[in-house]
Amino acid sequence: MSKITQNSNKLSKSAQNRVIYFLTILCSILFLFIGNKIANNEKTMVAESGNSTFHRSIVTEITGQEEVEYTFNEGSKGKSIFFKAKITDGDLKDTVVNSVQNYDPFTPVKLKEISVGDKILIYEDETNGEKEWVFGEYIRSDALIWLCLIFFVLLLIFGKGKGFNTILSLVFTCLAVFLMFIPAILSGQNIYFWTAITCFFIVASTLLIIYKADKMTLASALGCASGILVAYVITFIVDNVIHLTGLVDEQSTFLLFLREDNPLDLKAIVFSGIIIGAIGAIMDVSISISSALYEVKEKLKNPSFKDILKSGLNIGRDIMGTMSNTLILAYIGSSLSMVLLLAAYNTSILYLFNREMIVTEILQALVGSFALLSAIPATSLICAVIYTENGRKFITSKFKKREVDITEKKDDNVEQSWDINDIKTRINNKD
């Protein structure tokens, strides 16, 4: 009879997990849809003009080439390569057009000349009243798509069900950034608010889709929240101390002119970049610690609060070194070209390390590392409370004690009011 009861409990738990799983997916889709509608309110996007509409095409024939002399710079010669291309998309699909690829001598790196079979983007340009099709770019996105597909296949092979859930969570994460977060920024809405909303959605959807709705997921979510909160606080404090303007590069200047009536808050954009850049590492640390401590709880059967907390801190010490390196190296790698350029043309090391662009990159790495460090003890403490019986008793006893104190205060007030009434009655009787 007990085995039947256990089996029915397992079935009910698995059924609950499936219901929560599908509800999470449904709520995520609904959340993205509503969030996109709100974020796109009054959004001003840079629309493509007719002259810059790109078409996918394939080079079918090279028809010739000629040298071009530049009169404003004597001795400078360029080259124009003429070719035929077959358009493969849109209303002009299967149309063969005459196109040109222009080279100028001012390009520092020699570009690849087109050849038959190349997949390229072309656009129609109008010069001196004459229209011609011009080479725009090589199509590079196809290779990226294939690389992503290979990555997804490997996830499915090695991860199986977890691999599929990982792909699903990645899709939701990307959609949250591109359908909610970026449109909200471009529409001039509060960047701090949308950063918090995006972080909440990414953490909740990722943990509930990849993992079950259990104590481990709860501990991970609370650990992530603590790390993100620390990142918020440190960024706000440091922002006022080091006098950031948000003008870290040329792209930042261009952002100011997107909305002249209501310019984008560049400092807030730097802030959101720091938080969103660190959230992945924070989630990684939180789930690693909560998962490992859950296994410890299962093996020890009845571990103490101290055992879980100590184990969590030990695991965290092993994780924090590599994860901090991961964050710092990721930021250095993403801006390596600019760092090399600034290092080459700035003779003063003091000036170099006070440039806002360098300071912002260092700040991103440091704030992310602080968030990781705070997530380790926070997740360990939360796991110790949730996973252990004495931890739960400690929390419930605190709540019960508070309830008792509130009740006693109420009783004291009632007794005090009765005493006052009694005194008034006695005074009236004497009179």
Where are each of the predicted segments found?
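Extended, hydrophilic extramembrane loops/domains of integral membrane proteins
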Residues: 105-142
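Alpha-helical transmembrane segments and their helix-start/interface "positive-inside/aromatic belt" motifs
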Residues: 15-22, 215-228, 322-326
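Transmembrane alpha-helical segments that form the functional core of multipass membrane systems
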Residues: 149-256, 264-277
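Hydrophobic secretory-pathway targeting helix
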Residues: 1-49
